[in-house]
Amino acid sequence: MKIVLQKVSQASVVVDSKVISSIKHGYMLLVGISIDDSMAEIDKLSKKVLSLRIFEDESRNLWKKNIKEANGEILSVSQFTLMAKTKKGTKPDFHLAQKGHIAKELYEEFLKLLRSDLGEEKVKDGEFGAMMSCSLTNEGPVTIILDSDQ
C-alpha cells in the first residue's frame, strides 16, 4: 500500500464537471493498494496517517500536532497508478495493483478506520474507479510518501 500525503489549505475532487468533495485545512491523500495488501496494511497506514505530526502548534512550532489535534479534514482519492512499474519500456505496468473489486473493499475499510477516529464529516473521498480532476493548494509544501513495505 502506498499513500501520497499532502498538507493542504484546500482540496477538491471533480467528476463529470461537478465538485463531489472538498475540504479546507488538512490532508489530500492519494491511496494505492497492491496485490499483496490486506487489512494489516490498511490498519498500519491508517494509524500512521492519523498520528503523523505535520501541523504546527499555537506558537507556530512545526511538527507538533496530528490531523485530529489540528482539527483538520482529509480528502482521500483511490489511485491504482501509484503501483505503476516503469523499469521496462515506456508504458507503465500496473500488474502490482490490486483488482478493482478487492481494492474497493480494502479502500472502504481504510476510509472507515479514518472516519472512526476523526468523524464521518471530517473524511471525504473521491469516486472509486472514476476519472477525476483533483485540485489542491499544498501548504509548506509538505508532501510525504507512506509505504506499508517501509
UniProtKB/Swiss-Prot annotation:
Coiled coil: none annotated. It is an enzyme of class 3 (hydrolase). Disruption phenotype: 10-fold decrease in D-tyrosyl-tRNA(Tyr) deacylase activity, growth becomes more sensitive to D-tyrosine and is inhibited at 0.1 mM D-Tyr. Growth is also inhibited in the presence of 0.3 mM D-leucine; wild-type cells grow well in up to 0.3 mM D-Tyr and 10 mM D-Leu. No growth differences observed in the presence of the other D-amino acids. It catalyses: glycyl-tRNA(Ala) + H2O = tRNA(Ala) + glycine + H(+); a D-aminoacyl-tRNA + H2O = a tRNA + a D-alpha-amino acid + H(+); D-tyrosyl-tRNA(Tyr) + H2O = D-tyrosine + tRNA(Tyr). GO terms for cellular component: cytoplasm. It holds the Pfam family Tyr_Deacylase. The keyword Cytoplasm applies. A motif (Gly-cisPro motif, important for rejection of L-amino acids) lies at residues 140-141. Its EC number is 3.1.1.96. Keywords: Cytoplasm, Hydrolase, RNA-binding, tRNA-binding. It is found in: Cytoplasm. GO terms for molecular function: D-leucyl-tRNA(Leu) deacylase activity; D-tyrosyl-tRNA(Tyr) deacylase activity; tRNA binding. GO terms for biological process: D-leucine catabolic process; D-tyrosine catabolic process; tRNA metabolic process. Homodimer. Present with 4610 molecules/cell in log phase SD medium. PANTHER family: D-AMINOACYL-TRNA DEACYLASE 1, D-TYROSYL-TRNA TYR DEACYLASE. A Gly-cisPro motif from one monomer fits into the active site of the other monomer to allow specific chiral rejection of L-amino acids. An aminoacyl-tRNA editing enzyme that deacylates mischarged D-aminoacyl-tRNAs. Hydrolyzes D-tyrosyl-tRNA(Tyr) into D-tyrosine and free tRNA(Tyr). May also deacylate mischarged D-leucyl-tRNA(Leu). Also deacylates mischarged glycyl-tRNA(Ala), protecting cells against glycine mischarging by AlaRS. Acts via tRNA-based rather than protein-based catalysis; rejects L-amino acids rather than detecting D-amino acids in the active site. Belongs to the DTD family. This is D-aminoacyl-tRNA deacylase. The lineage of its organism: Eukaryota, Fungi, Dikarya, Ascomycota, Saccharomycotina. The gene is DTD1.
